[in-house]
Amino acid sequence: LNGGNVYRPTGKEKNLQAILNIHRHVIQNISPVTITAGKTLDIKIDNQSHILLITKGAIKVCRRIDSIVMGCGVSPMILGLVDAYADLYQLEENSDVFFIAETTCEYYPVPVKDFVEIADEKHLWRDISNILMYRIAFMTNRDRNLIGQDAYSQIKALLLELWSYPESSRFEINAQNFIQQRTGLSRSRIMQVLSELKSGDYIKILHGRLLELRNLPVSF
């Protein structure tokens, strides 16, 4: 989100080593769960809160009130850290978001109590803090790029965001849906912009999948 471009995470910013270190210590004697695109990932299992360690695929975070996509990410990642706070301190649970698999995903559910015990034993709280700080920075920068921007600027930002996904995940995602779910722009407006960009050889989309992206124009 610097200079009007989308904030694209790199390995250093995302603290991949922190995430992988947590995965390494926590994923032991746990069976993975695999779900297909469009399915909900439940952090509440058997009426017990869980942390979800995502090892494969892409996830989107949706606002419960209107299903607008608030954020997204690709593996490896960890879900449920914020919701775990309410569980740990017995606060009223009223999560404003829910998680949807954007592609086929694999994850390991870990009860919050067990996760906290492992975090204490293996001294993982610094890693957890780094992950949460990254998320705050990511969302702040992403909002700056989308809120109050014109339609083309929003579409450009999200095309760049989608392009930053691993190819295997990107090929499972419909570009038009990806943009509409995150902006609320009309389908016709999105398709108009995408059509113009394709005509100018800025992008290549086949069956809804973003295959190529070149330097996008500053304005439209």
Which residues does each PLM region occupy?
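Short beta-strand segments in beta-sandwich/barrel cores
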Residues: S31, T40, G57-R63, E106-Y107
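Polybasic "coupling" helices that flank or enter modular domains
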Residues: H123-G184
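Cyclic nucleotide-binding regulatory module and flanking cytosolic helices
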Residues: L1-L41, I78, D83-Q90
